[in-house]
Amino acid sequence: MLKKCIPLILLAISVHPSRGAEIRAVLAHPIFNVGYACTEHGADSSTWDLGDRFGIDCYVEKQVEVDGRSWERPYSGSGNRNEDWYAWQREVLSPCTCKVLDVSINLELNQPGRMGTKPASIFKLKREDGVIFHVVHFEKPLVKLGDAVVAGQVIARVGNSGLSQHPHIHVGAYQGSEPLQIRFDQHYIQPMEATKSK
């Protein structure tokens, strides 16, 4: 008698001590004044620092039409040049009304598709309630240490420095030793731009 073989698949699951617990969120002003998309960092995605856990990587997308078809994408052409990316050199807006707690600048520019090395250019911005935001991978800062900024104020331009493979802005937040999930205030979200390609 033949027995049916059932393949056994084993999955390695990383157990996180707070998995299942509700993650506190913080409301932030959108980081761009045009339509954009973000990818999120999970609880186990980084152990570098509190500004990385639950952080998000945001980039500008455009509605692209080619030969009667349309979709959203973050770059034109091959994407091999920083200038191909729609986020490149866009204005970066402050996520909060806060004070500039720290500024670090990395002038080394990455090429898309090639990971750079730490550190990236970073702002640390502190709200009155103690929430600290990290805004990372920018260039051409417009504010300095100790400046007071308001939510939505232009603070820099999008760059591509540090541990980054393409032009984008990373935003992270924490209060004390607790990382926070970021939610952008949708009252200020702008529509996506459109472009036509040949």
Give residue ranges: language-model regions.
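Sec-dependent signal peptide recognition
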Residues: 2-8
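Hydrophobic h-region of N-terminal signal peptides that target proteins for export
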Residues: 8-18
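Surface-exposed, glycine-biased beta-strand/turn segments
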Residues: 18-119
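Acidic, glycine-rich catalytic/binding loops that coordinate metals and/or anionic ligands
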Residues: 21-32, 36-52, 119, 140-154, ...
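Short histidine-centered loop motifs in beta-beta connectors
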Residues: 86, 93, 131-152
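Active-site-proximal beta-strands of protease catalytic cores
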Residues: 98, 147-162
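A residue-level detector for short acidic-glycine micro-motifs
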Residues: 102, 137-140, 157-160
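Active-site loop architecture of trypsin-fold serine endopeptidases
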Residues: 112, 158-170
